[in-house]
Amino acid sequence: MIAMKRLFPLIASALLAVLGAGSCADRTAAEPPLLITQVPLDYFNDSTAAVYLADLQRGGVDVVLVSLEEVFQTGAAREARMQRLRDAIRYFEDAGFRTGVWTNSLGYGGLRPELEAQYPGLLHLTEFGGRTGGAVCSTDTLFLGLMRRTVQDIARAGARFILMDDDLVQSVRPGFTCVCPGHLALLKAATGKDYTREQVRDLFTGAPSAERTAFLDVMGRSMTDFCRSLREAVDEVDPGIAMGICASYTHFDAEGVDMEELSRILAGQGHQPFLRLSGATYWPAVAPRFPGQTLGDVADFVRMQAGWYRDRDIILFDENDPYPRKSDIVPAAWCELYDKVMMAEGGVHRHKYMCCYQPQQPERAYVEAHVADMEDDAVLLGLFRSTAPCGFRVWEAEHRLRDLCLPVPYAGNGRMMVEASHSAAAAFLGANGVPSCYTGAGGPGIAFGDQARLLPSEAFAGGLVLDVPAALALLSRGVDVGLAAAQPLDAPSAESFDGGEPQPVSPAGTCYGLVPREGVDVRVLGEFVAGGKRVPSCLLCRTPDGTFAIYGWDGYDQLFRQPRFWGSTDRMHQLREIYTLLSGGKELPASLRDAGGMYALAALSADGKRLSVLLCNPGKDAVSAPCLEIPGKWSVSRTLRTEAAREDGALVLSSLPAGGWCVVQLAIPASTRRRFSCP
């Protein structure tokens, strides 16, 4: 098997001895990220072990997670299952793999008849309307006792580390937050007041309040108390066993917790925390939560989280999960594209669910696609070594719910969970083939939604792209963005760009006619046609507080709903122009001339002499001759899976097949580097 790869010099930490990994924050490391995969215990036996082992060895896997679900058996049945776990751990350890155990807890929302039959009366996660499912609440002390026993049994089985799955979450299954009797009782204890479910719901409307903060604090304490108790249970068996958690998309805000704190609680004394980020390959294919979400949107969601945690000394890995692990539902090519984006981004280890299959009915596509790409993966890592992503800096606050001004009446569970987690700004850039980055400051940035009120001062240095809620939030903070009013419009029928002919549009939600403040230095970059009139749809305003490009819509109304309105060739050209206007004449290092459903990630070396660009095509059709706009002088120094030619000042690549990807690396002379503006 391929030897264990170490990313960076080991820190004195027991967890590093377990994973053989560093926090992955240093992009200059010569070694690649670790490759982690899972093997389901329920399918592991004497007749299947060799099948798994062969795939792990062929795939160059470093760390194995034996996955163990729903551990609620008792007596002989439980002991038999735990013996199988001990056998599996020993088998993979003897074969040279670092081996841990992945397990679930509160539940995925489906009914759990075996559990309910043994333990009737469990508290279930409850949404504002009173609906429940099979997921149990963290406030249930009986269930906590069951989980303490489970993690102790796993520790005794010989696991080097334990990873709790993303069902350790109090939202999603079935709603936004939890208002079960347990949480309502905790809220009363904290505030001295009785609350109904509906009254808690209404805390998430209008202006921020002490009551909203109190409820989120209660939610957070119930989760941290649950996790602290699990950590203590493992310590009673072996404090040398580290624990980590898989993030759900609501973990970073709606749960009321701080994920760094939660990760450190679970990790235990002397262990470096580890955290699997949220954002799975299957989301665009089978998850009903975000209809219209693209694979690029998912990748940007993971990249955003990585940006938050890059310098916090936490081991990060991604969620490359093609659930239900059938390639006719989630294409194997998507797993490879996701993998390429995260390797190009850097700073995140690879958690690739390519062995989660039944050997009796094997799904070979994921392993075979991975093996076929291994040599090129190594080349890709080299092309992006010592680089950092460039483009518009996406500004997103990790914690925002306590401070947001929210719609009245309540906007609904779906809108709340998305606005408290995903980035509408990143999705807008992605729909237009415009590269983005999630760390650094100084270059042009973008922020959508009311969360813009939380922007740090350094976000203003390079100018900002805003939607209407972001602009109004900054105005309420006393920032002069140059806007006098945003007037709601009947649905616009068309939009023109920089004085051009109007093009038909069909936006979602409310659009606005923008009215600049009197006397402001303003330029109209676009106009809506609504009710027979033309009104500004995009303004560039220069004020004493900065330079702002304002779009006449609510980004979260558009998110995952109207990609054709957001993404167009005209909009792409407009964004390139905005970048130059915000940066005082600097230019985007790279962008697509026509996105065509492709995803682009661009990265510059620290000295600016190398520009590497990854293109991915998750679509069902090939893209003929994709074209990159790259300003100034440059030369092609390396290509991977493509051919490149300069035509009319742009870089034209060979056709990109459906599910295909390619990389081009350019040498950038000093004269061109001076034209770039990057965080």
Model regions and ranges:
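Active-site-adjacent "subsite" loops/lids of carbohydrate-active enzymes
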Residues: 98-157, 195-216, 228
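Aromatic- and acidic-residue-enriched segments that line the glycan-binding/catalytic groove
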Residues: 78-81, 108-130, 165-203, 259-263, ...
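A conserved amphipathic helix/loop scaffold
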Residues: 420, 436-440, 448-660, 666-679
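Aromatic-lined carbohydrate-recognition surfaces of secreted/lumenal glycan-active proteins
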Residues: 34-42, 100-105, 163-167, 213-256, ...
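Catalytic domains of carbohydrate-active enzymes, especially glycoside hydrolases
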Residues: 46-72, 156-161, 273-275, 338-350, ...
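Hydrophobic targeting/anchoring helices
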Residues: 242-412, 504-505, 526, 549-553, ...
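Active-site neighborhood of glycoside hydrolase catalytic domains
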Residues: 146, 157, 161, 178-243
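The substrate-binding groove and active-site-proximal loops of carbohydrate-active enzymes
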Residues: 35-44, 67-80, 129-146, 207-224, ...
